[in-house]
């Protein structure tokens, strides 16, 4: 006679009774559910960190404002390039940081508007390269280092104010801008639209855009996959924990009604931020998608903020 445990294992291997068949079916369904969830979440995360849109080239030689291309280096990640629009000699420089899946060429009118006020303006590009891991973005961690490198390169020029810079950004760009402002005293004013506290928050918002944010297993699997990709940055604290460092630095927080999740986070960061600070609420965000009248109003608001906070 077989021992009871051997009989049980044999029944699971070759089920003949209804309950053993049910157990085997449940185990198989659970296994394939986990495998499917892992595959789907991995595919979604891959699509998020490898955005499809990129910066388009322009003919700098014939573009108004006489822009020039600049290059700056990142440790172990090669070089990047930016577009520098010269303003008044020894004037501050404003760096414009594009958002997620946004090309820098979409910000050219904003750059021109700020250049007309006498500022030096630089457009950075987050979309033109991939890291050694093959990803195009980690939703902010690496982008902070990119604009830090751009700012340090600009600070070596003799035709700009080497100690005063302004930053502007939206979503991805705003996270990078505010994060750099919290750690670099050369940043004297910062304007952020639809900013988030951690890259994981942006990941959840993007997962909702893919329609899997409320499904079982998929969000947690996706978050674990993203955390694995960005494990080297796990110790970086949220922006909210570093806001006290910005005491005395003028800040403009812009909330867009058409991005309600990001608007709530932006409002919370505004509330937690030390003075001086300003708050602006818009019906429509994302400068590139605005109508012409909305763009002009937006340009005037950004220019007004920097004129009062970062005098030439």
PLM features: residue spans?
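An N-terminal hydrophobic leader/cap segment in hydrolases
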Residues: 4-5, 9, 18-73, 80-83
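Serine-hydrolase catalytic core
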Residues: 72-74, 83, 229-311
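Short beta-strand element of the alpha/beta-hydrolase
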Residues: 91-99
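Conserved alpha/beta-hydrolase
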Residues: 111-133
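Alpha/beta-hydrolase active-site loop
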Residues: 137-158
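Alpha/beta-hydrolase fold nucleophile elbow
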Residues: 159-171
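Glycine-rich nucleophile elbow surrounding the catalytic serine of serine-hydrolase chemistry
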Residues: 169-179
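Hydrolase active-site cap/lid region
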Residues: 180-232, 244, 249-250, 264
């Amino acid at each position: 006679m077989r021992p009871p445990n051997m009989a049980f294992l044999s029944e699971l291997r070759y089920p003949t009774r209804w309950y053993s068949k049910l157990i085997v079916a449940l185990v198989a369904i659970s296994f394939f559910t986990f495998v499917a969830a892992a595959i789907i979440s991995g595919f979604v995360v891959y699509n998020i960190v490898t955005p499809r849109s990129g910066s388009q080239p322009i003919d700098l030689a014939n573009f108004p404002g006489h822009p020039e291309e600049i290059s700056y280096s990142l440790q172990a990640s090669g070089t990047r390039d930016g577009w520098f629009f010269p303003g008044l000699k020894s004037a501050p420089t404003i760096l414009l940081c594009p958002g997620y899946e946004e090309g820098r060429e979409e910000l050219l009118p904003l750059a021109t508007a700020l250049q007309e006020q006498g500022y030096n303006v630089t457009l950075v590009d987050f979309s033109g390269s991939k890291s050694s891991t093959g990803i195009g973005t980690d939703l902010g961690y690496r982008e902070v280092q990119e604009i830090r490198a751009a700012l340090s390169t600009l600070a070596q020029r003799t035709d700009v104010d080497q100690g005063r810079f302004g930053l502007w950004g939206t979503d991805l760009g705003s996270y990078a801008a505010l994060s750099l402002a919290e750690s670099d005293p050369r940043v004297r004013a910062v304007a952020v639209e639809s900013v988030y506290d951690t890259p994981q928050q942006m990941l959840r918002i993007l997962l909702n855009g893919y329609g899997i944010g409320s499904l079982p297993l998929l969000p947690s699997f996706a978050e674990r996959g993203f955390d694995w990709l960005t494990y080297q940055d796990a110790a970086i604290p949220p922006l909210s924990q570093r806001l006290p460092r910005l005491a005395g630095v003028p800040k403009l927080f812009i909330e867009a009604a058409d991005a309600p999740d990001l608007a709530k986070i932006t409002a919370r960061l505004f509330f937690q931020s030390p003075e001086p600070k300003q708050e602006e609420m818009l019906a429509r965000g994302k400068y590139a998608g605005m109508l012409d009248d909305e763009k002009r109003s937006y340009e005037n608001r950004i220019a007004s903020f920097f004129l009062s906070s970062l005098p030439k």
